[in-house]
């Protein structure tokens, strides 16, 4: 089976500063992969490169088996329909209400009638556990957690195969964060999504990721399950994965798996 994302010998430089050097990574269909690393390690840069938003200095990226950055507009449009990205702060259109935000990509297609768009929007709202009455609220009237859910509903409106999440629980209190993680986990199972996320939150990482890629020293320092990563003897990994908070998050994950 063709991997969803293939990154081969990727290097990234901004001015004189190298962010990545000779980085390679494969993400298979249906898995949940987390990218973690310190500030400036290039996590979000890599996430954006995976879908063609940023051009690497060297190397190649293939998405669903197709090379990116070819300049082929038709290919880019076709690939663009197969993935969606949830940005850290939702990126909702402030002058649109919730319904209009979710309907926007559907209307852009120009081939779906308004009755069907209405039904699809209401379905996606239900999928992210929001009510029909929420459709008529403006973004300024939404809580942080609701903004995340509306942005997720908009992403799901195009029936993507690949979902990319940039700090999906940033700014949420623990209860709302846990609820959002459960929602993503449920949608991953129901829809067979491939999910790639950037996070620094240990509870999110433990609650979602099947595999983790640790970015440090301009490369992928370690790749594997959380249990495998924790066996790697490196200062960043010890500090990130072996602190008291990490142990509590992992213990919570183990308790959930037993239920």
What annotation goes with each model-predicted range?
Residues 138-142, 146:
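Conserved ABC ATPase signature
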Residues 51:
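Helix-to-loop junction immediately C-terminal to a conserved catalytic motif
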Residues 159:
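Conserved catalytic motifs of ABC-family nucleotide-binding domains
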Residues 115-133:
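Conserved ABC ATPase "signature" region
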Residues 163-166:
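Catalytic Walker B motif of ABC-type/P-loop ATPase nucleotide-binding domains
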């Amino acid at each position: 089976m063709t991997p969803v994302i293939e990154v081969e010998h990727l290097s990234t430089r901004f001015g004189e500063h190298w962010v990545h050097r000779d980085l390679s990574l494969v993400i298979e269909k249906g898995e949940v992969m987390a990218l973690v690393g310190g500030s400036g390690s290039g996590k979000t840069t890599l996430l954006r490169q995976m879908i063609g938003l940023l051009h690497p200095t060297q190397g190649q990226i293939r998405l669903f088996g197709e090379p990116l950055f070819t300049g082929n507009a038709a290919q880019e449009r076709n690939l663009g329909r197969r993935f969606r990205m949830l940005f850290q702060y939702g990126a909702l259109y402030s002058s649109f209400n919730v319904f209009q935000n979710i309907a926007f990509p559907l209307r852009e297609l120009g081939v779906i009638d308004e009755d069907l768009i209405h039904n699809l929007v209401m379905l996606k709202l239900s999928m992210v556990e929001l009510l029909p009455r929420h459709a008529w609220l403006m973004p300024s009237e939404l809580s942080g957690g609701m903004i995340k859910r509306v942005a997720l509903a908009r992403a799901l409106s195009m029936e993507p195969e690949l979902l990319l999440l940039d700090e999906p629980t940033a700014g949420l209190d623990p209860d709302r964060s846990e609820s959002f993680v459960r929602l993503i986990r449920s949608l991953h199972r129901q829809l067979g999504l491939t999910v790639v996320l950037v996070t620094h939150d240990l509870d999110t990482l433990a609650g979602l990721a099947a595999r983790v890629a640790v970015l440090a020293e301009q490369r992928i320092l370690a790749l594997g399950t959380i249990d495998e990563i924790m066996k790697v003897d490196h200062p960043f990994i010890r500090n990130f994965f072996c602190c008291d908070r990490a142990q509590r998050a992992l213990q919570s994950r183990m308790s959930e798996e037993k239920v």
